[in-house]
Regions:
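Gly/Gly-Pro-rich "capping" loops immediately C-terminal to redox-active cysteine motifs
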Residues: 42, 57-84, 132, 150-176, ...
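Electrostatic cytochrome c docking/interface patches
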Residues: 23-45, 60-63, 114-139, 153-156, ...
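C-terminal functional regions that serve as terminal interaction/effector modules
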Residues: 254, 266, 281-284, 294, ...
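The canonical Cys-X-X-Cys-His
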Residues: 49-55, 109, 113, 139-149, ...
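C-terminal motif of bacterial Sec signal peptides marking the signal peptidase cleavage site
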Residues: 18-21
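Positively charged n-region of N-terminal signal peptides that target proteins for export
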Residues: 2-8
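Extended non-catalytic domains of envelope/secretory-pathway proteins
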Residues: 144-146, 159, 164-167, 195-199, ...
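C-terminal capping alpha-helices of c-type cytochrome domains
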Residues: 97-122, 190-212, 277-300, 347, ...
Length: 383
């Protein structure tokens, strides 16, 4: 996160001018001019489409989009992208069904789904999404060791409050995925998604780190050994690199143990091993005492823009289709939560073709932001 996440605001602000043109013009052709036969479309839906989209237009499984009351010109455009192979990867061979329909059949079945009433929400989700609040809830299992706010009270445990969120995510993923070995950490993290880890990291990063008074008479005796450390971690243990942890004010036992583990190759990090390989135990202990005695500083991380503010920008295009059929953008309210996440992720990662959405979604660095937008819209009443 850090610098990457701080760029988030810049990217979003630069994208605002693009929002006015975020849908493509309808393709010319005869398909849109064909008459719609709702009864014929219903019969086609029963035979070809209901297995996935239901007769009521609700996806029968997670990640299948709801089609009921969707804008018919958008449905037509989407079906054409499948027919032209632009979305083959998102549904595999499933949408080859659309290729087997005649133009009049396709027009009618899409007209049928567009004519259906909006669907009611099945879930009881709130449209409100707060990175901090969600991170606080998800971090409950961390509190026993790291403290409820990330200020630990146990010896040998790192303080997470005020730490760079990008580093917290990186370290948590290493424990979750097993590249760092600690069974207790792996057990607590194994079920957490990337978005979950980001929310937890944001929560801890925004909490104020508490200083602990040093009990050592001369804590600065170790500064002479920290010249190489300072290049990455800062001269006083506060790093400007968001991927590198702050050491200032960390627990002395934790620092002592981890620095030795890098020196002894118990943790894999070539550069750290190279720097530490010649240091003796007592020298590392002095380094740990020095950094532990420094006052911790809070990361300069800027929180992501609130989801409600981002949704207002999305609405500039995705609400206008109700009154302007030329805007080929889908309705998002009440849409399937997982489908929205996967669709936005595909646009962000370049796996779906839409130049406008690529530009807009490229600003969504965080999976948590995508999850938040999906939560916002899926919880709203369909229209």
């Amino acid at each position: 996160m850090g610098d990457v996440m701080n760029k988030y605001f810049v990217v979003i602000s630069l994208l605002l001018p693009l929002l006015s043109g975020c849908s493509e013009k309808p393709q010319s052709g005869e398909l849109q001019k064909l008459p719609v036969d709702i009864n014929a479309g219903k019969a086609i839906a029963q035979k070809n489409c209901s297995g996935c989209h239901g007769m009521d237009g609700r996806g029968v499984q997670d990640n299948i989009p709801n089609l009921a009351a969707q804008i018919d010109t958008y449905l037509l455009k989407a079906a054409q992208t499948y027919d032209h192979g632009k979305r083959a990867g998102s549904s595999g061979d499933v949408m080859k069904i659309a290729k087997d329909l005649s133009p009049i059949q396709l027009r009618s079945v899409l007209g049928y789904y567009a004519s259906l009433p909006p669907l009611g929400n099945l879930g009881n989700k709130s449209a409100n999404y707060s990175y901090f609040d969600r991170g606080e809830a998800l971090s409950k299992p961390c509190a026993a060791c790291h403290g409820a706010d990330g200020n630990q009270t146990s010896a040998g445990v790192p303080r997470l409050a005020g730490q760079h969120p990008q580093y917290i995510v990186k370290a948590a993923k290493a424990y979750r995925d097993g590249t760092r070995t600690m069974p207790a950490m792996h057990e607590k993290l194994t079920a957490l998604s990337q978005a979950d880890l980001e929310n937890i990291a944001i929560y801890f990063a925004l909490n104020k780190p508490k200083a602990v008074a040093s009990k050592v008479a001369n804590p600065y005796a170790g500064k002479q050994f920290t010249n190489q450390c300072a290049k990455c971690h800062g001269s006083m243990g506060s790093s400007e690199d968001a991927s590198v942890p702050n050491l200032a004010g960390q627990d002395v036992n934790y620092l002592n143990t981890k620095i030795k583990s890098y020196r002894d190759k118990m943790r894999d990090h070539g550069e750290m091993h190279k720097i530490l390989s010649e240091l003796k135990d007592n020298e590392i202990e002095k380094i740990a005492i020095f950094f532990a005695a420094e006052q911790p500083t809070q990361t300069n991380f800027i929180p992501p823009e609130p989801i409600t503010a981002l949704a207002q920008k999305c609405d500039l295009c995705h609400n206008i289709g109700n009154t302007n059929p030329a805007m080929l953008t889908p309705k998002l309210k009440g849409q399937n939560h997982t489908y929205l996440i996967n669709a936005m992720t595909a646009y962000r990662d370049g796996d779906r073709g839409s130049s406008a959405m690529h530009k807009i979604s490229s600003g969504l660095y965080l999976d948590a932001t995508i999850e938040g937008i999906a939560t916002h819209y899926s919880a709203e009443a369909a229209n």
